[in-house]
Each structure stands twice: as C-alpha cells, then as structure tokens.
A protein has these predicted regions:
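Mid-to-C-terminal alpha-helical segments outside catalytic/metal-binding sites
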Residues: 1-14, 18, 23-53, 158-188
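Active-site micro-motifs of SAM-dependent methyltransferase domains
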Residues: 18-20, 61, 97, 127, ...
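Acidic-enriched, low-complexity/disordered segments with a strong bias for Aspartate over Glutamate
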Residues: 13, 21, 29-32, 38, ...
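Divalent metal-dependent hydrolysis catalytic cores, especially in the metallo-beta-lactamase
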Residues: 29-66, 88-96, 118-119, 125
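Active-site gating/metal-coordination segments in enzymes
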Residues: 68-157
Length: 188
C-alpha cells in the first residue's frame, strides 16, 4: 500500500487555540505568539492543508479569550466562531476558577444548552487546580451526567504535578463512563 500524501490527507485538528476578533482588536500592538491565533488565518491554513474540522480549545483563563473576562463571554465568543464557519469547528467550554463549583457547572450547562458547545476543556496548569480536585470532580460529574467529552491539557513534569499521570489515571477510573463512552482527551 502506498503511503498517503500528508498534504492531501483529510485531517481533524484536535486542539487549536484561537482568540476572538475582539481580543485582537483590543490588542493591536501585540507582538507575541497569540497574534497568529486568528480565526480567518486559521481557516486559510485549514484549506491549504485539508483540515476538514478543528476543535477550538480555550485556556481556563478568561483574560485570554474575551474582553469581558468571564466564562460566559468566552462561551459566546466560541459560539460565534463556530457560527461564522458552520460545520468547520467544534468548541469546548471554558472554566473560570474564580467562580464556585456550582457557578461553574451552571456556566457549563449554559455553554452546552445555549451556545451549542461540544465539550469541556480542563487545563490544570493554567487553572492552578489539580485534575483530581473537588472542583474538577464536580465538572467531571456534570460531564458524565450530560454525556459530554472532557479534554484535559496535560504536560506533567513532576510526580505531584497538577496533571500528573497518577491524577489522570485516578480521574479516568473514577469517571470511567466518561473515559470510555464519551472520551477524555489528553492534550499536551
């Protein structure tokens, strides 16, 4: 069997950070890497590289994904990005650890019900919360109840890291229904 040509092979990008236009507009002099996290630029990259769909992932830091600095604003921005390019993007809901567990679960419910977001993104190193914390366990319980996938951004560097392998295994075992039926994606 001949090897596939990577350029023409159809692809799914499972983890792309894209900043909303409002953030780019508010920071016109930005010269960091995020200046390239632009939706229109990325759609062109998708066309050039036969990326059929992509998953837009937030950061668990609403200061990067909105100018209102709330999870609700992030969710509206993510929904708008999906709306602009129907059928091209999935988008995962964000969390804001400044909110209580109950407020976060309510925000996730609205993100899925009102904004048609497709899953939940957890980034323990950005949120400062261990993957197996009570806070995140409430999120996993919600995801299991609602049958939505959870993506975990993980780059554990130490045994006790917030996203250490033992925490991932423990969480996957405790949320086995999600892990095996709805998929827990590990990103890193």
């Amino acid at each position: 069997m001949a090897a596939a040509n990577w350029r023409t092979l159809k692809k799914l990008d499972a983890h792309i950070p894209i900043l909303p236009d409002a953030v780019h507009t508010a920071n016109p002099d930005s010269e960091d890497v995020w200046v390239y996290a632009d939706l229109r630029q990325y759609v062109q990259i998708m066309r050039e590289n036969h990326i059929e769909r992509a998953v837009i992932m937030p950061f668990n830091d609403p200061f990067l994904m909105s100018m209102e600095f709330t999870a609700g604003a992030v969710h509206r921005n993510l929904a708008e990005m999906k709306r602009r390019y129907p059928g091209r993007f999935y988008a995962f809901a964000d969390i804001d650890v400044r909110n209580s567990r109950a407020e976060t679960v309510d925000a996730l419910c609205r993100a899925i019900d009102d904004h048609a977001l497709d899953g939940i993104k957890l980034h323990p190193n950005n949120s400062g919360l261990a993957l197996d914390s009570d806070y995140n366990c409430a999120i996993f319980a919600f995801a299991q109840e609602r049958r939505v996938p959870v993506a975990v951004h993980s780059y554990p560097n130490a045994e006790d890291d917030l996203s250490a392998a033992k925490r991932i295994v423990k969480t996957a075992e405790e949320a086995a229904e999600i892990a095996y039926e709805n998929a827990v994606a590990l990103l890193g």
